[in-house]
């Protein structure tokens, strides 16, 4: 009998397993893939604050350090933002293959059992416990646990069966494609974001430096607005921008841009990370929120074991923690995202022109909003309930 079984060894799952094990719980962490951290399905960016509040930074899993972001409007108007203003995805670019394994190793060091090539086939709640059916190398076996934590990604089998989440609609998920490229000639102290409805309908393109002339070059599009695949939009972006380099890796995937879900718990069950749609609806970034959610899930699991109460009512303490941390931001950024996808390229150019050339490092958010409102007064009405 385990206290906690965690499914999925990404940042959320490994963090949950590590935190629960550190509280003295008997923990099992399973990952269906052969290697933790592969394939990489994100741009790998995270702010310094988001990573340093949980870990002592190890240069082995830092691919690059960036000091700001450059954002390009469709007409190439450039906006330069400081690291502090650029959000949760700017500061470090991680080497996710190494970082994810590092967090899983910390979970094991804390006492968690970690199995790779192990998939969750099914689960059943019975008599206040959860029976979890696992499959490894073609063999099935069952384990019993008091708490099941689903960190099994955007299409969470656990979340759907528990009735916590439903299948996402085409306007609630971004389709993403990304190349790892080498031989690039870029200033590696910045991350780069490219906007435009023609370029990336409902999303944006990005370049995240990884050092030594390499970078993640990717794009995210909203399937409801897109007329082609994400990869086709990515290839068109690279050709249009004249990006010359060698493609050494390709990944594709989906990122939830749902916003804040009502609850991430059911009896005996908690969801964390992409499984709970914790990714930022504007940026699609999810590492920072996943780490925080995993930490909160592990802490609440320990409290539940101590109280011997695994009901949804008790586990809603987890909802309170993640909602108080980043729930408001998810709600706000979902509303901003809905406004953003309505903007045509002409309006994006106009807004960018209103703040381009200004020293944003010395401007408050309120001052920037004021400049944007001068360029587009209707924004004041559209966004009145966000600030």
Swiss-Prot record:
Entry's Gene Ontology cellular component terms: cytoplasm; membrane
Pathways per UniProt: Membrane lipid metabolism; glycerophospholipid metabolism
Mitochondrion found in the keyword field: no
BP GO terms, sorted: glycerophospholipid biosynthetic process; membrane lipid biosynthetic process
Cofactor(s) required, per the database record: FAD
Binding site for a 2,3-bis-O-(geranylgeranyl)-sn-glycerol 1-phospholipid: 329, 365
Keywords noted in UniProt: Cytoplasm, FAD, Flavoprotein, Lipid biosynthesis, Lipid metabolism, Oxidoreductase, Phospholipid biosynthesis, Phospholipid metabolism
Pfam families, sorted: FAD_binding_3, GGR_cat
InterPro entries noted in UniProt: DGGGPL_reductase (IPR023590), FAD-bd (IPR002938), FAD/NAD-bd_sf (IPR036188), Geranylgeranyl_Rdtase_fam (IPR011777), Geranylgeranyl_reductase (IPR050407), GGR_cat (IPR054715)
Main location: cytoplasm
Cofactor-binding details, from the entry: Binds 1 FAD per subunit.
Signal peptide: none
EC number(s) on file: 1.3.-.-
Molecular function GO labels: FAD binding; geranylgeranyl reductase activity; oxidoreductase activity, acting on the CH-CH group of donors, NAD or NADP as acceptor
Subcellular location: Cytoplasm
Catalytic reaction annotation: a 2,3-bis-O-phytanyl-sn-glycerol 1-phospholipid + 8 A = a 2,3-bis-O-(geranylgeranyl)-sn-glycerol 1-phospholipid + 8 AH2; 2,3-bis-O-(phytanyl)-sn-glycerol 1-phosphate + 8 A = 2,3-bis-O-(geranylgeranyl)-sn-glycerol 1-phosphate + 8 AH2; CDP-2,3-bis-O-(geranylgeranyl)-sn-glycerol + 8 AH2 = CDP-2,3-bis-O-(phytanyl)-sn-glycerol + 8 A; archaetidylserine + 8 AH2 = 2,3-bis-O-phytanyl-sn-glycero-3-phospho-L-serine + 8 A
Binding site for FAD: 12, 31, 42-43, 45, 96, 274, 286-287
Additional free-text comment from the UniProt record: Reduction reaction proceeds via syn addition of hydrogen for double bonds.
Family in the record: Belongs to the geranylgeranyl reductase family. DGGGPL reductase subfamily.
Function: Is involved in the reduction of 2,3-digeranylgeranylglycerophospholipids (unsaturated archaeols) into 2,3-diphytanylglycerophospholipids (saturated archaeols) in the biosynthesis of archaeal membrane lipids. Catalyzes the formation of archaetidic acid (2,3-di-O-phytanyl-sn-glyceryl phosphate) from 2,3-di-O-geranylgeranylglyceryl phosphate (DGGGP) via the hydrogenation of each double bond of the isoprenoid chains. Is not active with NADPH as an electron donor. Is not able to reduce the prenyl group of respiratory quinones.
Protein's UniProt name: Digeranylgeranylglycerophospholipid reductase
Record organism: Archaeoglobus fulgidus (strain ATCC 49558 / DSM 4304 / JCM 9628 / NBRC 100126 / VC-16)
């Amino acid at each position: 009998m385990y206290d906690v079984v965690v499914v999925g060894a990404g940042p959320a799952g490994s963090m949950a397993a590590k935190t629960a094990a550190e509280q003295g719980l008997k923990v099992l962490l399973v990952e269906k893939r052969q290697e933790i951290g592969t394939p990489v399905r994100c741009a790998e960016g995270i702010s310094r604050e988001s990573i340093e509040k949980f870990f002592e930074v190890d240069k082995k899993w830092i691919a690059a350090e960036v000091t700001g972001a450059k954002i390009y409007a469709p007409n190439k108007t450039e906006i330069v933002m400081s690291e502090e203003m650029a959000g949760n995805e700017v500061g470090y670019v991680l080497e996710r293959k190494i970082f994810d394994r590092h967090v899983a190793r910390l979970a094991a060091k804390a006492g968690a059992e970690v199995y790779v090539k192990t998939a969750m086939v099914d689960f059943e709640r019975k008599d206040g416990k959860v029976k979890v059916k696992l499959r490894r190398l073609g063999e099935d076996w069952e384990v019993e646990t008091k708490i099941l934590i689903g960190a099994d990604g955007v299409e969470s089998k656990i979340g759907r069966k528990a009735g916590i989440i439903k299948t996402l609609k085409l306007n609630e998920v971004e389709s993403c494609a990304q190349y790892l490229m080498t031989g690039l000639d870029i200033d590696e102290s910045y991350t780069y974001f490219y906007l435009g409805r023609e370029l990336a309908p409902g999303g944006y393109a990005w370049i995240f430096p990884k050092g030594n002339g390499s970078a993640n070059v990717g794009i995210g599009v909203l399937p409801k607005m897109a007329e082609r695949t994400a990869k086709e939009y990515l290839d068109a972006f690279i050709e249009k921008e004249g990006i010359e380099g060698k493609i050494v890796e390709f990944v594709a995937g989906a990122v939830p841009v749902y916003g804040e879900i009502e609850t991430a718990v059911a009896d005996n069950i908690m969801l964390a990370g992409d499984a709970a749609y914790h990714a930022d609806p504007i940026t699609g970034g999810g590492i920072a929120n996943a780490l925080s959610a995993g930490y909160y899930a592990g802490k609440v699991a320990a409290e539940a074991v101590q109280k011997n109460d695994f009901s949804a009512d008790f586990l809603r303490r987890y909802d309170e923690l993640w909602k108080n941390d980043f729930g408001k931001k998810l709600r706000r950024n979902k509303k901003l995202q809905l406004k953003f996808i309505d903007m045509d390229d002409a309006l994006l150019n106009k807004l960018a022109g209103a703040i381009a050339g200004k020293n944003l490092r010395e401007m408050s958010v309120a001052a920037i909003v004021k400049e944007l409102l001068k360029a587009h007064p209707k924004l004041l009405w559209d966004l009145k309930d966000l600030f």
